[in-house]
Regions:
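N-terminal cap/lid segment of alpha/beta-hydrolase-fold proteins
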Residues: 1-32
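Active-site glycine-rich loops that stabilize anionic/oxyanionic intermediates
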Residues: 42-46, 232
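Catalytic nucleophile-loop/oxyanion-hole region of alpha/beta-hydrolase
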Residues: 45-48, 74-108, 271-276
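Conserved alpha/beta-hydrolase
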Residues: 48-50, 55-79
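Alpha/beta-hydrolase-fold enzymes
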Residues: 116-201
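Short beta-strand/loop motif that positions the catalytic acidic residue
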Residues: 222, 228-230, 234
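Short alpha-helix in the alpha/beta-hydrolase fold that links the catalytic acid
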Residues: 224, 238-247
Length: 288
């Protein structure tokens, strides 16, 4: 039995979003008792079931962990990879945060997002009064900068055209699965996971390829404690994006960790490497 299986009781549930769709989420409640709440948003094409390494790492930290399957992902409703307004992710996330606060009897939560999920939680935090719900913000592999080669330049130009003309048209995201982790078992599991998909709508692809300026503008508005981390060899979301956003943060309590040699999913790297990643994350969590 794994660490997380011993440490938590697990619940599954759904809620209806503003558009009538069913949004799936999981709750992991520590058997030793809960002190705090963490809400986790996954990356593009994946789902909430891929975060057991995180659950292991914080098993003794007293967090009830809520993990969402974003619309169009995992077990939630919606065409795979299709969204026509990024703010729909914000609305669904807000609903889950409100559910977590109400169920756990807390006023504030810690919010963590990876990759596309990092973009969701980062941009969400800078909107309206959303920071009032947060103790802290954590981002993994914030995807506001991508490789700038000729193929990507063409995709960016075509994506903008298609996003306006055919926003729900799905195209292959072109993700090189070998670049998610050095751990071959992680890559193999990703490829064989029936809940993982590789298609992205023209609108969503265009948004993620062109959200750099929005993210930098948002950074100045973020005042809550924030921990950002990124693999320096990430070829999917370039680590300089996290650096640029970090430098513009309005928060006086901010930390950025860059990990030499690591790929996109640093929390799913080889056991030795991810141990280092989680040691730094847990050390920061312990202070917040």
């Amino acid at each position: 039995m794994s660490i997380w299986e011993k440490a938590y009781s697990r619940e599954e549930s759904t809620f209806q979003n503003k558009d009538g769709g069913k949004i799936y989420y999981q709750v992991y409640r520590p058997k030793s008792g809960a002190k705090k709440v963490m809400v986790v948003h996954h990356g593009f094409g994946e789902h909430s079931g891929r975060y057991t390494n995180l659950l292991d790492a914080i098993a003794d930290k007293g967090y009830v962990v809520y993990l969402i399957d974003a619309r169009g992902h995992g077990r939630s409703d919606g065409r795979r990879g299709v969204i026509t307004d990024f703010a729909d992710f914000f609305a669904d996330l807000k609903q889950l945060i409100d559910i977590a606060k109400q169920k756990e009897g807390v006023q504030k939560i810690t919010l963590l997002g990876h990759s596309m999920g990092a973009a969701v939680v980062f941009l969400y935090t800078g909107k309206d009064n959303n920071q009032n719900d947060l103790n802290a913000l954590i981002t993994s592999a914030l995807p506001i900068k991508v490789q700038t080669d000729l193929v990507m330049d063409i995709k960016k130009a075509a994506g903008g055209f298609l996003a306006k003309l055919l926003p729900t048209l799905t195209i292959p995201a072109g993700l090189d699965v070998n670049m998610i982790s050095h751990d071959k078992s992680v890559v193999e599991a990703y490829v064989n996971d029936p809940l993982v998909h590789g298609n992205i709508s023209a609108y969503l692809g265009d948004f993620l390829l062109n959200c750099y300026d929005d993210a930098l503008e948002t950074a100045a508005k973020i005042k809550v404690p924030i921990y950002m981390f990124h693999g320096k060899e990430d070829q999917i979301a370039i680590s300089t994006g996290s650096i640029d956003a970090f430098e513009r943060l309005g928060s006086s309590d901010k930390t950025l960790k860059l990990f030499d040699g690591l790929y996109h999913e640093s929390m799913n790297e080889t056991p030795r490497e991810r141990e280092i990643v989680f040691k730094e994350l847990v050390a920061w969590i312990d202070k917040h």
